[in-house]
Amino acid sequence: MDKMKDIKLIALDLDGTTLADSDTLSKRTHTAIESAIKSGITVVAASGRPFVMMPDSVMNIVGLDYAITSNGAVISKCGKTVHRSLILPDDVLKILGAVRNDDVILEGFIDGFTYADVRYVHRPLDYGCEPEYFEYTRSCHGKIVDMRSFLASIEMSLTSSAL
């Protein structure tokens, strides 16, 4: 138990691990997180989701102040962004060029919103999405028919992207 004193930070991936389903924590997990915080450990929620889609069941835990979101591109403290890693428009074009001959599903995070290929949103199972996340995927993603053109046409930096 003395080794627990050496732990300073716990980063918890949410989807498919910490969460019982797409939005809730089990009572046991909730209690364990609260216990860690009370013992002085910084607990960080981490997710591919944008911050606005982080579940209240996690973000409302007193003392859980930090979140790493948008596939690691955004760090927030108490709901305010403290760091963002952006993909510049020229780099977006390079990425699109690198996969131009591949049948890939593209997803982009822009200012807290998620945009995804309509094929992924309508048929998430075909692209590896777990059934318990279908509703989340369908509800939070902007449905774009031609993601390549959409991403190539934006004149702002992406917060994050996924292939």
Where are these regions (language model features)?
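C-terminal cap/substrate-recognition subdomain and adjoining C-terminal extension
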Residues: 139-163
